[in-house]
């Protein structure tokens, strides 16, 4: 008789190899064809609803690993909420306006693009944005997201733009909009103002220039005394309009080479060394306040400017006397405005080239950086040059063009964010943060910005519905409301197609007045900041339960959303806010095409499978920056195999011939009850971690449980599963335990590795089951009696097992045994022992067990 044929070996179509790269897309097609998302939505429609609002990615280019991290985390949240008994709402979105799309369209054929009308340019930009959405949508779906991608919002939707115009009108009603000539970040390459969130900093070689201005008149200084000044922007010197000193700092008058100089006293020694002025002699100290009303001669031109008192002056760099040019610095601008020096000399045009404002033919037509050498040479001719050096300095750059950014004064529209800061501060207190430091971070970002520049000098954006009368903006509610009504009636593009009179309120037209339309568009952060209107328009719960984006969005989307929400609805558009870190290469370096270390999430999906990428996301502490690369992914693959084979395949293979019934109908042995109890404890722990969005600890708990099961319970039940009769009550009870583990854990695994969970579900032999694992709500928890006793028993056994297995391993290394089944375990107990030695056979696969004395090791036969 062939005894092997009598064994009930595991049988399942759930393969050892996941074949994720081919199977995943089959499951995605299955979910789509069976309309699984829609069925889940209907199934949960009467449950409490939770809304995760999607911060829109920019519709340009392929998705990167940061996009993948973000969208997968959002998918984890939504699936977690479903598992916890909530209905979920998630509407994907795309940010479609802005400069990068304009650049992408124009660079294909610059000459042709330049010849087009505004409407034609805008149409090309729109078509490009739509094409990018189609590409990104397919790429996001490859990640296994449980979303309805047939319904999504775009910031170029007509309805979206109309809501944004209403937001603008609301800001006007609250007297929050004003126009001013003041410095903002300016990109000479992009020829537009930029937001703080569009700036990145790079270390570049910068010139440090020391020069002098000669005193004309002063209460404490002699005429001809030299004011020593430091600057890193020599090109701004022609527009110098003041020098700032700190009123409370101590300044020093000293002599060198028969000339008198003034410098901050605390910097004198270091500057003397730097310049090589070893024989400089100190004369007297002067307080900064005493220098007020001092006047000096411009370093290049025949004009006289004042010394002003400013608290922004620093004592740890430069000379303590600050060159002030209100057109090219915010501190400079506010200081001059405070002292009624209201004229800001804007010497550069939008391309960063000197215009004729200065009436300086040599500078006119020069790019600002090329003017530095010309200006330094002139300083030398005027005997105002002292010293120059090169050093590394963090300078602002345009995050899109990667080119230097300057501060430049221009006429822009601003929102008075300072006027809403008290309301913002009150509302932030109501928001839940996983990390309270992030609450402080958001508050700091919101409260440090007094004004928000919302105008952009670009074609591709939502037009600002503003009309000028004799070059003065008509910021009254009646005029703007009428203009917006016309735009809503005839379409946003009508602004670029119809005459000015079409948008003018007939009641407001005055004879002899020249009217014109605003040519600027609203900045993209004003677009994306108003995306909460998607929820309001769809009559969904507002505010959203959660906003989840990268940590850079504290100065970006979180910031603009908070401001827009307060302006339009008097509340923040989110109840909870969490942020994730950036993705780095496996060595901890920032990813860069130039370094060749960019990790492509789509290539990872093609090589390993989306579930492997998702499992990587599960493995990271998403609140901080995390590394990814081939070596890291290979470790994830090993973890995946353990879950797939040691847990799922073992269970499914041993459920063959199982008659599914009620848990109460089975006769469970002691070891079965312990596993049921431990499964219940795990499920409760996992739910707690999910509520905290702690997916890493979820995975750790699952992995620990799998190792425990495979190292003990699965080992000791193999004889029963393989050798006992199909209908043996003990065997059937153990199958019931395996089934219980599967049904309790498959929902959690579906959060993280949904393709694998679906694969397991389709090979799960339950006769009447939901068509997809995504529709499986999970069974009720089966409780076993004497939980405390089971815990105590398990702890005692674990202690015995650990000691015994350590001794066994030592015996194996010493050559005493070669296999575990050669061991006889002798267990010493007394009346207080929690474990009965006669029941140890249920806990171990050792050959024999018998009671005896501690440390008594049986001899090898």
Curated annotation (Swiss-Prot):
A motif ('HIGH' region) lies at residues 57-67. L-isoleucyl-5'-AMP binds at residue 549. It is an enzyme of class 6 (ligase). ATP binds at residue 593. It is found in: Cytoplasm. GO terms for biological process: isoleucyl-tRNA aminoacylation. Belongs to the class-I aminoacyl-tRNA synthetase family. IleS type 1 subfamily. Monomer. PANTHER family: ISOLEUCINE--TRNA LIGASE, MITOCHONDRIAL (PTHR42765:SF1), SOLEUCYL-TRNA SYNTHETASE (PTHR42765). This is Isoleucine--tRNA ligase. It comes from Mycoplasma pneumoniae (strain ATCC 29342 / M129 / Subtype 1).
């Amino acid at each position: 008789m062939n005894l092997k044929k009598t064994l009930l070996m595991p049988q399942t179509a759930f393969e050892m190899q996941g074949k994720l790269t081919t199977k995943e897309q089959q499951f995605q097609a299955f979910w789509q064809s069976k309309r699984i998302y829609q069925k889940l939505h209907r199934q949960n429609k009467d449950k409490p609803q939770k809304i995760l609002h999607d911060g829109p990615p920019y519709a340009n280019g392929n998705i990167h690993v940061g996009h993948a991290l973000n969208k997968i985390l959002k998918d984890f949240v939504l699936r977690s909420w479903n598992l916890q008994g909530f209905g979920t709402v998630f509407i994907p979105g795309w940010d479609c306006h802005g400069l990068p799309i304009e650049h992408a369209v124009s660079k294909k054929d610059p000459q042709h693009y330049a010849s087009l009308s505004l409407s034609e340019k805008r149409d090309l930009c729109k078509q490009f944005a739509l094409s990018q959405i189609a590409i990104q949508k397919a790429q996001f779906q490859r990640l296994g997201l449980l979303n309805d991608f047939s319904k999504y919002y775009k910031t170029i939707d007509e309805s979206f733009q109309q809501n944004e115009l209403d937001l603008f009108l609301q800001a006007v009603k609250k007297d929050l909009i004003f126009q001013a000539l003041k410095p903002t970040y300016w990109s000479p390459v992009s020829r537009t103002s930029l937001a703080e969130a569009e700036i990145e900093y790079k270390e570049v070689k910068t010139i440090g220039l020391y020069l002098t201005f000669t005193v004309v008149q002063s209460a404490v200084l002699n005429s001809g005394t030299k004011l020593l000044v430091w600057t890193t922007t020599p090109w701004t010197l022609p527009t110098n309009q003041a020098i700032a000193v700190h009123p409370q700092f101590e300044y020093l008058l000293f002599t060198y080479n028969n000339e008198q100089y003034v410098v901050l006293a605390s910097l004198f020694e270091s500057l003397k060394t730097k310049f090589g002025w070893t024989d400089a002699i100190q004369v007297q100290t002067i307080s900064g306040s005493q220098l007020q009303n001092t006047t000096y001669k411009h370093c290049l031109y025949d004009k006289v400017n004042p010394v002003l008192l400013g608290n922004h002056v620093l004592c740890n760099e430069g000379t303590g006397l600050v060159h002030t040019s209100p057109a090219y610095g915010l501190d400079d601008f506010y200081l001059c405005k405070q002292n009624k020096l209201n004229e800001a000399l804007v010497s550069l045009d939008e391309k960063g080239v000197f215009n004729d404002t200065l009436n300086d033919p040599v500078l006119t037509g020069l790019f600002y950086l090329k003017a530095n050498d010309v200006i330094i040479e002139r300083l030398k001719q005027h005997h105002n040059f002292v010293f120059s050096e090169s050093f590394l300095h963090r300078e602002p750059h345009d995050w899109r063009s990667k080119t230097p950014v300057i501060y430049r004064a221009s006429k822009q529209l601003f929102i008075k964010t300072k006027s809403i800061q008290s309301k913002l501060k009150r509302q932030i207190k109501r928001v839940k943060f996983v990390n309270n430091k992030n609450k402080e971070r958001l508050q700091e970002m919101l409260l440090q910005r007094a004004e928000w520049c919302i105008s952009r000098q670009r074609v591709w954006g939502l037009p600002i519905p503003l009309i000028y009368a004799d070059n003065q903006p008509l910021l009254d509610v009646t005029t703007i409301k009428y203009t917006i009504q016309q735009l809503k009636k005839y379409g946003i593009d009508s602004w670029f197609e119809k005459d000015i009179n079409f948008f003018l309120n007939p009641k407001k037209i005055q004879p002899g007045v020249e009217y014109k339309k605003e040519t600027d568009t609203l900045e993209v952060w004003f677009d994306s900041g108003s995306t909460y209107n998607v929820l309001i328009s769809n009559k969904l719960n507002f505010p959203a339960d959660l906003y989840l984006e990268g940590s850079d969005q504290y100065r970006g989307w979180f910031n603009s959303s908070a401001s827009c929400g307060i302006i339009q609805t008097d509340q923040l558009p989110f109840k909870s806010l969490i942020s994730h870190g950036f993705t780095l290469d496996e060595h901890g370096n920032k990813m860069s095409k130039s370094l060749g270390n960019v990790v492509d999430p789509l290539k990872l999906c093609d090589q390993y499978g989306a579930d492997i990428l998702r499992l990587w996301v599960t493995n990271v502490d998403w609140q901080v920056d995390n590394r990814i690369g081939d070596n890291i992914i290979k470790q994830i693959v090993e973890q995946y195999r353990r879950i797939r084979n040691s847990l799922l395949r073992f269970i499914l293979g041993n459920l063959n011939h199982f008659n599914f019934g009620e848990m109460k109908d089975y006769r469970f042995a002691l070891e079965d009850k312990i596993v049921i109890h431990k499964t219940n404890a795990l499920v409760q722990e996992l739910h707690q971690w999910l509520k905290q969005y702690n997916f890493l600890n979820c995975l750790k708990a699952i992995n620990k449980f799998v190792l425990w099961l495979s190292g003990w319970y699965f080992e000791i039940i193999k004889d029963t599963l393989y050798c006992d009769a199909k209908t043996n009550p003990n065997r059937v009870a153990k199958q019931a335990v395996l089934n219980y583990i599967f049904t309790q854990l498959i929902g959690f695994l579906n959060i993280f590795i949904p393709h694998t969970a679906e694969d397991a579900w389709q090979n799960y032999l339950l006769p009447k089951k939901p068509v997809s694992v995504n529709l499986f709500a999970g069974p009720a928890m089966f409780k076993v009696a004497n939980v405390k006793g089971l815990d105590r028993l398990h702890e005692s056994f674990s202690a015995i097992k650990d000691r015994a297995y350590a001794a066994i391993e030592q015996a194996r290394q010493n050559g005493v045994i070669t296999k575990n089944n050669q061991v006889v375990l002798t267990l010493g107990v007394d009346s207080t022992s929690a474990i009965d030695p006669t029941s140890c056979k249920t806990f171990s696969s050792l050959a024999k067990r018998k009671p005896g004395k501690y440390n008594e090791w049986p001899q090898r036969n």
